[in-house]
Amino acid sequence: LECHNQQSSQAPTTKTCSGETNCYKKWWSDHRGTIIERGCGCPKVKPGVKLNCCRTDRCNN
């Protein structure tokens, strides 16, 4: 599985996630604006953090 792993609005980068079946994108707002984090897996998130998990290559941009 190949997942995006760039932060927020940086140029897209990807990494190969061996053994993973999900990519994730999570985002939240703070004083800097909207922060976006991407990576492998499907983490648990705190209340107020939005999460999208998906199961195809590069689906989490």
UniProtKB/Swiss-Prot annotation:
Which InterPro entries does the UniProt entry name for this protein? Snake_3FTx, Snake_toxin-like_sf, Snake_toxin_con_site, Toxin_cobra-type
> Which GO molecular function, any one, fits this protein according to its record?
toxin activity
One of the record's GO cellular component terms: extracellular region
Please list the tissues where expression of this protein has been recorded. Answer: Expressed by the venom gland.
The alphabetical list of record keywords is: Acetylcholine receptor inhibiting toxin, Disulfide bond, Ion channel impairing toxin, Neurotoxin, Postsynaptic neurotoxin, Secreted, Toxin
List the Gene3D superfamilies hit by this protein, alphabetically. CD59 (2.10.60.10)
Query: Where's it found, cell-wise?
Result: Secreted
Q: Which cysteines are joined by disulfide bonds?
A: C3-C23, C17-C40, C42-C53, C54-C59
CDD domains, A to Z = TFP_snake_toxin
This chain's function reads: Binds to muscle nicotinic acetylcholine receptor (nAChR) and inhibit acetylcholine from binding to the receptor, thereby impairing neuromuscular transmission.
The family annotation for this protein states:
Belongs to the three-finger toxin family. Short-chain subfamily. Type I alpha-neurotoxin sub-subfamily.
The name of this protein is: Short neurotoxin 1
Q: Which organism is it from?
A: Naja philippinensis
